[in-house]
Structures are given as structure tokens and as C-alpha cells.
Amino acid sequence: MSRAIIENAGEHRVSILINGMYPIDNINDVKMAYRDLLTDEDMFIFSAVAPTAYRHIENHGRSKAAQAARDIAIANIAPDIVYVISFFEGHSDSYTVSIPADNVPWKTVCVCHDLIPLLNKERYLGDPNFREFYMNKLAEFERADAIFAISQSAAQEVIEYTDIASDRVLNISSAVGEEFAVIDYSAERIQSLKDKYSLPDEFILSLAMIEPRKNIEALIHAYSLLPAELQQRYPMVLAYKVQPEQLERILRLAESYGLSRSQLIFTGFLTDDDLIALYNLCKLFVFPSLHEGFGLPPLEAMRCGAATLGSNITSLPEVIGWEDAMFNPHDVQDIRRVMEKALTDEAFYRELKAHALAQSAKFSWANTAHLAIEGFTRLLQSSQETDAGQAESVTASRLQMMQKIDALSEVDRLGLAWAVARNSFKRHTRKLLVDISVLAHDDAKTGIQRVSRSILSELLKSGVPGYEVSAVYYTPGECYRYANQYLSSHFPGEFGADEPVLFSKDDVLIATDLTAHLFPELVTQIDSMRAAGAFACFVVHDILPLRRPEWSIEGIQRDFPIWLSCLAEHADRLICVSASVAEDVKAWIAENRHWVKPNPLQTVSNFHLGADLDASVPSTGMPDNAQALLAAMAAAPSFIMVGTMEPRKGHAQTLAAFEELWREGKDYNLFIVGKQGWNVDSLCEKLRHHPQLNKKLFWLQNISDEFLAELYARSRALIFASQGEGFGLPLIEAAQKKLPVIIRDIPVFKEIAQEHAWYFSGEAPSDIAKAVEEWLALYEQNAHPRSENINWLTWKQSAEFLLKNLPIIAPAAKQ
């Protein structure tokens, strides 16, 4: 119904309000159901403190407070109408709806599905707690400005059994989805269903839950009265989900009527696809309910072309629409009579089939939506305009209401303070928060941390229209805090203390650091911010520890599967540093669906990193021997490698290649720029004692970005021999300096450099030695690939590229 209203709303703006106390999976499901119709801007989540289920008396204070918190959220959305699709909920869970008793600047319209508990108090209101809950809700229900009933029968119940005047009640009817339709199934599909549910070739079908008003006992009794040949030809298939004790009771009842247990087939739970198939395949659908608000199963069956019989009371005559197809559900002989006629009178059966399609075509969600929108319009036309400023008075009154609730603990009150702040959408300025959890604690000056520094710097410098840009960090066992002390020490201006972060609607967290060590603990924080309407986005630099675990230390091997599975299940967006990484992430998630349940709202995309060292908040300073190093570089063709030394980086193979070249008498220099990393102890020991060290071999650790830029400018070429990268910043930095590149032919390098690099393959030293010689020959002829033709971005452009991948809401155009 709600989707149809949105689809047919025309010039009217429609928003949805989601209960933030529900599990994040439920919130995901709701967003998923509307994401093709509504923008994130029109999806609101209200916060409150759970649990609020009325069945537990200790929750009553929180329940009242949650209603007040919801009112504050609504006041900040400032709608003309609040449309409550299901009102009598919240006894067993934290579902929260209410109709204010005081004057508020919106109208409330409630859907009435039925008043079955009110009309059957002995059966449904025997529990004093539930009776109190239901009658309280009914008193609230009567305050609604309008009631939209799903049938004329339900509308009449409202008029007759409540204090709601008839001019406030409108029948908008109901409908079923387009998936319920006549379908021509293949023989293979039919046989599969028969095998799955032990179905005969022909059968009578009924569908319901096991409860007295569904009248299954009368149906079984009536079926037992059919002639034996009809029973034998048409077993009864009951699409009921039953508990073992219920099943045994029903089977004993059937035996008491002379039926064998094999004549009743219980399907158990049915998927929608299988239910639709059974509607299509059944000989007859029978629905003997004693009371319905509408009666969806008969309409579903008729939409699927099934010959359909049903009760002649409450709403079912409106749905079935033909007296001859109905029976008195209290009279088993009448049920038997109509069933037997349908199974033996061919002309009547054909009429039932034809009527099913003609009658079901009268119901559609579009018709229901149009009736609802007409009702909204009439309600507003008959109402006085409200003062939008009343939103502030609603907030003030609800805060006073919360203060007077004695049953709230101090923890409850603290949670409600945060909830009220989150629900105050009008006062909220959207925030773009850069997660620098690693950088804020320890800037190890790795490539990833250079990315974090650069992106943060550009976002702070350029700003994002409509958003406050800041940095945050997470400390295990605590919460997210603003990284204001870090900002104060690295950027001009005063930023204040490291206060806790209050995530609110449309805020965006973008984690540029690698925070695998914080998972799975960080999941609670992510779910909490998303339940407040914020977005959690993470940059993925690579997943090499998952693809090649031997390249990583044990801790990373342990953390990475947890990290990526948590991101797949809980993050809104994964933004990879290259298309190659994005494809790898998608593939890994697909390969691991047996244990990873990805967030259905999640998108995986990519951007490219920047390269301008000047904009990456570069370190400065020249080493004492800078001039000697630069002179050595100028004295012979010099090749440079840049990056932390790790097994995958190819340093050992490259060193061995140059040793071959030196043995051949080649006067080439190799400059290795990078500190010692993991599992390269023997290689580093070899470097420290190498006979060519500081002659033709130079190992530079912890140099400044300023000096690195000098080395790029004076080298003959960059050698990038890595066997795996997410992006490869040195490649882009070299291109920016117009430094030619000799690189391994891995997918990400081909994505970035394309034909503008000299590629090699193989893991033997001779493969690199050969590539160097071939490249030099081309270089001497001025025919080598030109790295300056590689497309690269400044950090400003990279930050802009990143923003396009984030759920940033553009500022509204000025009128």
C-alpha cells in the first residue's frame, strides 16, 4: 500500500519514518523496499531507548518516552499528515506509534485492518496485560483525524464499535502484488513441487494460520463429508505452518471424522514462489474463515486463476464477490455442498475460474492509493492551517513529559538525551567525518596513512557544501570521538577537545585508514550510527592478505577475514582505490556467501588516489648526505624502488637482477627507498653488508617527502616489481614527475598505466634484468613508453572523486 501511495503521490512529498530501535537488518529491509522510490533524504529514522514492549511492566516508562521521542522526530520532519499503517502493535516488541492527545501541527491517519480482538474479547483479550494494552491503544486510535479501513466490513466495525464518527472513516480497500498471476509452469517445475511437498496430481488447497477463527476444523469436517471418490481424487493440501502438538491434534480430529492421515497434506512454510505455484496448480481453493478484515488469500488465489470458495461473512463477500461461490462457515454441510458442486459441476467450475480473474482485476494497489490520497486531500482541505513554529513547542512539551516519567533510570535518560538530539533533524547540520583512527594514534607514514592525511587535508581545505567536515577516531572500548587534538597539531585553527561524536541523519563517516584491528568490536558503533540514519563508508586499499596470506603477518591474516566480512555485512559503501580491487572485493564476497551475509543496501565502487606530494601534507628536510646521494644518482643510470620492504614487493628479485647486471659490468645504480617491513630480515641483513652498498646500491630509510621528490626527479626510471597492490602510489608519483616506469604486469598496474609503462613478467632475476636492458635501449632511442601520459589525479581531484562515491546530499537550490 505504502509503495503505491508514493508512486501515485504526484506533487505531494512523501517521507517514511523508521523505528531506530529495530535491529539494523530490519532497518536495511525497510530502506531496501523503498530505495527505488525515495531518496535517502526522505527516509527518516527516529531514535529512542529500548526495550519498550508493553508486555513487561518495567518497559512502560521507556514506552511513553519512546512515543515522546517519536513525536519530536515527527515535529522536526514537519509533515502535514502522519499515516500509520499498523497501529495495534508494540505489545511484544519495540514497535512504537501513538496519537498525541494535545494539539500538534500534523494530522494522524490510521489504517484499520480489523477490530477482531475487540469483537472477540474472550478469545483474544483474556490476558489482562494484553487487554490493557489493546484497550489503551483503542482509546488512542479513536483520537485519529481519519481512519482508512481496508474493507467496508472493517469500516463498519469502526463505526459501530468505537466512538469514531462515520465521516472520519473511509474504505480504501486492499490488493495484492503483481507477482500473483496466472503462470504456465514447466513439467520440471511442477514435478519439483510435487516432490518437495508430496503433492498429488490434483488437490484442494487451503491457506491460513492455526487459530480458531480460521475454522480449519470445520473445513476438515466438511471435507470428510464429501463422497469417497472425491476425497480419493482430491486430497486436501493445507498450506499451514503448524507446531508438532497442533499437527497431532488436527490429525486426530481428522481420524475422528473417518479420514486417514494421508488424506491431509501439510506443506509447512511456503516461499512466495511456491505459494503462487500452488495457487496456480490447485483444483480448488477454499477459505472458511469466521472473521477477516479483508482476506488476502482468496484474492491471491483468484489472481492466480484458482477456482475460489469462501465464507459469506465479514469482509469476504467484498473480496470473492459472488454469492454462489460462498458458504456459511458455521455450517459444515453448506461448506461440503459448495465444495462438492465445484468438484462435480463442470459448468459451475468454469464459471468459478472465469469469475476469479474478473473479480480479482477490480483490486489494485493503485486504486487503493488513489482513494487514500483523495482522503488525505479532503482531510487537509477541511483543516485549519497549522503554524510550523509549533514544532518547537512539541519538542518542549515532550521533553517536559519525559522529565516526569519516574520509571526511567539515569541510563535511560542519558540515552533519551542522545535520541532527542538525533531526532532534532531541523537543528542538525550534516557532518562528513573522516575516520583517522590509526593516523590519530600513530602516523607511521605508510602509503595508506599518506592517503588519509591527503584526503583529510583536501576535504578540510575545500569543504563540502552543506556539511561540516571534521576528523574522528575510535579507541577500543570507548566510542567515536572528534580528532580535534590531532587537527590542532597539524592544521591551522582551534578545534576544541576530543568530544564524543553524535551521529545523526545523513551524516557520513568515511574511513580512509585501515582499521582491521578494530573489528569486530567496531560493528556495534557502525550499526548504532546507521540506526541513527548516518552512513558508514570505508575505503578498501586491497585485500591481498585474503588472496595471498603468505604475504602478511599472522595478525593480519587473522584480522582480515573478520574485517572484510564485517564491512560486507554492516557498511553502506565500500570504496576501493582501483577497479581491480573493487572487482576483487565483489568476487570475495560472492565466494563467501555461505558465511558472509552482505548488507543488501551496500554498493562497492572505486576511485583513484592522488599523487601530488605537495598536497599530501608532506614531510620536509634533507639528509646530511643528500648532495652525495644526488651526485651518485647523476653519475650513472639510476633506478629507484619506493615502498616499505615486504616479501611481495619484489626487492629480492630486483636486487638479484642488478647483481647479474653488475657482474656483467653494467654501471647502473639501484636506490631502494623504504623502511624494513615484515619477514625481510635476511634480505635487509644482506643489504646492510652488501659489497655495493653506497657504491651502486643505496638503501634509504625514513627520508622526507621533500627528498623523495628530489630522487624521483633525478632517477632514470622507477622499478615497481610488486606482485600485488591495491593501487600503487609510487607509480602515480613517478608519472607526475615524468619519471619512466618499469613495472610488473599485474592487473592494477595495467589499469592505471595502460600502454604508458614498460612491463615485465616472471619471477626470475633475469626477467627484471632483461626488462631493464630492453627499456634502456628504447630510452637511448627516445622510444620508451612515456609515463607522463598516465592519467593521474591531484589529491584535490582524488578527494572530489571520492565524494562522488559517498552518499552526499546536494544543498537545496535557492528559490
Curated annotation (Swiss-Prot):
* GO BP annotations, alphabetical order: O antigen biosynthetic process
Q: What is the enzyme's main class?
A: transferase
- Major localization listed first in the record, in broad terms: membrane
Which stretches does the entry tag as region Alpha-(1->2)-mannosyltransferase?
1-374
Q: Which GO terms describe its cellular component?
A: plasma membrane
Q: In which pathway does it act?
A: Bacterial outer membrane biogenesis; LPS O-antigen biosynthesis
Catalytic activity, EC? 2.4.1.371
Please give the knockout or disruption phenotype noted for this protein: Elimination of the C-terminal half by transposon insertion or gene deletion causes synthesis of an altered structural O-polysaccharide consisting only of alpha-1,2-linked mannose.
Q: Where is the segment annotated Alpha-(1->3)-mannosyltransferase?
A: 431-804
User: How does this chain sit within the bilayer?
Assistant: Peripheral membrane protein
Output the superkingdom of the source species: Bacteria
Q: Which family does the UniProt entry place this protein in?
A: Belongs to the glycosyltransferase group 1 family. Glycosyltransferase 4 subfamily.
Q: What is known of its domains?
A: Composed of two domains of similar size, connected by an alpha-helix chain. Both N- and C-terminal domains are required for the synthesis of the complete E.coli O9a polysaccharide.
Q: Note on file?
A: This enzyme is specific for the E.coli serotype O9a O-antigen.
Biological role: Mannosyltransferase involved in the biosynthesis of the repeat unit of the lipopolysaccharide (LPS) O-antigen region. Catalyzes the polymerization of a tetrasaccharide repeat unit containing two alpha-(1->3)- and two alpha-(1->2)-linked mannopyranose residues.
Q: How does it assemble?
A: Monomer. Interacts with the C-terminal region of WbdD.
Give the protein's recorded name.
Serotype-specific mannosyltransferase WbdA
Organism equals Escherichia coli
Q: What is the lineage of its organism?
A: Bacteria, Pseudomonadati, Pseudomonadota, Gammaproteobacteria, Enterobacterales
- In the UniProt record, the gene name given for this protein reads wbdA
